């Protein structure tokens, strides 16, 4: 009963923080947006710990990287901070993919499934990169390409796990797809279209949903 109450309380806190953050994005309230952004991952990590029977240090490490990435991306228009944010999220994705890989491998996926799941998200990431490559600073082009492929591998690993019947893989796949959507919107906003409140809301709505679904999926696994 205490566990249920804790999950309920943390869910309510995460929803409240998320709603406040999205409202701040939509209204252009920068101080409130920055403050609430740094609350999101600690709340999601706490919710994961409350839901999981045995929380994985690998998943918690990935969530910490997400929190660090959130901090750096507040200042995304400074090239050094953008690079640091990509590095933090990239490391987080490596940890996420590693943990999903363990779940997927245990379910013994078929080779064809693994190949198909790898090619489709990878093609999406490559398309986004080649559309934007001339607008991306030269120093960030290779890291950006590698980051996109790493992000695609998150969805690939989750799909492999889903087809193989791994527990929680449906949530992980949905989270991986939303992560790709979020970062795709962010890439266009940063390198082509310029900032807008609507784009900020879209980026953060899909990002929050992605991280929450990953937390639920990992807790189920």
Residue ranges and their predicted role:
Residues 2-221:
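Polytopic alpha-helical membrane-helix bundles and their juxtamembrane interface segments
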């Amino acid at each position: 009963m205490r566990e249920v109450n804790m999950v309920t309380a943390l869910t309510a806190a995460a929803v409240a923080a998320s709603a406040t953050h999205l409202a701040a994005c939509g209204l252009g309230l920068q101080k409130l947006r920055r403050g609430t952004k740094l609350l999101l991952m600690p709340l999601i990590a706490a919710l994961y710990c409350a839901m999981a029977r045995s929380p994985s240090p690998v998943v918690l490490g990935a969530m910490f990287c997400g929190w660090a990435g959130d901090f750096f991306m507040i200042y995304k228009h400074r090239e050094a901070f953008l690079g640091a944010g990509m590095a933090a999220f990239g490391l987080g994705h490596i940890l996420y993919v590693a943990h999903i890989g363990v779940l997927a491998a245990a379910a013994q996926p078929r080779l064809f499934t693994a190949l198909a799941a790898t090619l489709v998200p990878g093609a999406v990431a490559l398309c986004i990169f080649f559309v934007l490559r001339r607008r991306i600073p030269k120093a960030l082009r290779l890291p950006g390409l590698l980051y996109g492929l790493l992000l695609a591998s998150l969805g690939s690993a989750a799909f492999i796990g889903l087809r193989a019947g791994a527990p929680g893989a449906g949530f992980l796949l949905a989270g991986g797809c939303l992560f790709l959507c979020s970062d795709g919107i962010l890439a266009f906003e940063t390198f082509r279209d310029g900032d807008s409140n609507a784009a900020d809301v879209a980026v953060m709505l899909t990002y929050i949903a992605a991280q929450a679904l990953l937390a639920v999926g990992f807790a189920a696994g």
